[in-house]
C-alpha cells in the first residue's frame, strides 16, 4: 500500500495520506454495526446522543417562530423530564442566527450557522467569506462551511485548502466545521484525502454531509473519516472533532456512530466538544426509547 505526502499552503504543511483498504474498512464498519448497547448502558447512550446533537432546520420556509421553537426544544428536549440533557447546538441559516442567539441566551446550547454558499460552495471566495463574517457578527458560535468539491475533484487541492484557511480566519473565535459532502467525493480515498486537507487547513471539525443529497452519512464513510482524524492526531498532536449528518433518524443509528467513534478514537471523543450528530428528526426517536 503506497503512502503519499501531499503539501499544502505557503508554509509547506505536509500530510501523509495512506490509501484506504476498502474491503477491510467496510468489513470493520459492518462488524461495529453488530455491537449492541447493554441494557444498563442504554440510558447513558441515549443521553450522550442528545448531548452530542446539533438540532437542525435548514429549510427555505424557516421563520423566526420556527427557530424559536427549535431552540426551546434544544434547551428542554423533554419538558416532563428534567434529567434529559439539552442538545449541543442548533444549526440554522445565517439569517436566523440573531433569533437563535436570543432564544438560547443563558444556556449551554451553541448556535451553529451554515455559511459560505451552503450547500454547494459555488460562489466567489469573497462572497463566501462575507457570508461567514456576517454569521459571526450575528453571534454564531460555530460555522459550518462546505468543501469546494468542484476545485477538489478537479485536482486543485491547493485552492480548496486556501479557501478553508481563509474561512477559518474569517471565523475569529467561532469554531469551524468543514462539510466534505462525502456522497459526492466518489471513493474512500477521496474522503480520506479531503479529511486530511480540511484538518491541515485548520478545521476544528470535519463533517460528513449537508443533508441535501441522498448519499449522505454512512458507517463506512464515518469510519473512514474517524481513521483520518486518528492518524492526523498521531502526526500532528492536534485533535479534530467529527460530525455525522444526513439521514440519521433513529436512536439505533446514533448508537452505531457512537460505537464507531469510541472504538476508533477513544472515549475522549465521546463528548459534544469532539463529536456531533446533525439531525432534525432524530431527537424524537431518541426520546421515545
Question: Which residue stretches match the model-derived regions?
Answer:
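N-terminal start-of-chain detector that recognizes signal peptides
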Residues: 20-24, 28-31, 84, 215-216, ...
Amino acid at each position: 500500500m503506497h503512502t503519499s505526502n501531499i503539501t499544502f499552503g505557503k508554509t509547506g504543511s505536509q500530510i501523509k495520506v495512506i490509501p484506504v483498504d476498502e474491503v477491510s474498512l467496510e468489513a470493520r464498519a459492518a462488524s461495529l454495526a453488530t455491537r449492541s448497547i447493554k441494557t444498563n448502558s442504554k440510558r447513558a447512550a441515549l443521553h450522550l446522543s442528545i448531548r452530542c446533537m446539533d438540532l437542525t432546520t435548514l429549510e427555505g420556509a424557516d421563520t423566526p417562530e420556527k427557530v424559536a421553537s427549535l431552540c426551546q426544544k434544544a434547551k428542554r428536549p423533554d419538558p416532563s423530564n428534567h434529567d434529559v440533557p439539552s442538545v449541543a447546538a442548533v444549526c440554522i441559516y445565517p439569517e436566523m442566527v440573531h433569533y437563535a442567539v436570543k432564544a438560547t441566551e443563558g444556556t449551554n446550547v451553541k448556535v451553529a450557522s451554515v455559511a459560505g454558499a451552503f450547500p454547494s460552495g459555488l460562489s466567489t471566495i469573497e462572497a463566501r467569506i462575507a457570508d461567514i463574517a456576517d454569521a459571526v457578527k450575528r453571534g454564531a458560535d460555530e460555522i459550518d462551511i462546505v468543501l469546494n468539491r468542484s476545485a477538489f475533484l478537479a485536482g486543485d487541492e491547493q485552492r480548496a485548502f486556501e479557501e478553508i484557511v481563509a474561512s477559518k480566519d474569517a471565523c475569529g473565535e467561532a469554531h469551524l466545521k468543514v462539510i466534505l459532502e462525502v456522497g459526492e467525493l466518489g471513493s474512500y480515498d477521496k474522503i480520506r484525502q479531503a479529511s486530511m486537507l480540511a484538518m491541515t487547513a485548520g478545521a476544528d471539525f470535519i463533517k460528513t454531509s449537508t443533508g441535501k443529497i441522498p448519499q449522505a452519512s454512512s458507517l463506512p464513510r464515518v469510519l473512514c473519516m474517524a481513521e483520518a482524524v486518528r492518524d492526523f492526531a498521531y502526526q500532528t498532536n492536534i485533535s479534530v472533532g467529527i460530525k455525522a449528518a444526513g439521514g440519521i433518524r433513529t436512536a439505533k443509528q446514533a448508537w452505531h456512530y457512537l460505537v464507531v467513534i469510541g472504538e476508533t478514537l477513544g472515549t475522549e471523543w465521546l463528548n459534544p466538544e469532539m463529536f456531533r450528530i446533525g439531525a432534525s428528526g432524530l431527537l424524537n426517536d431518541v426520546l421515545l426509547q
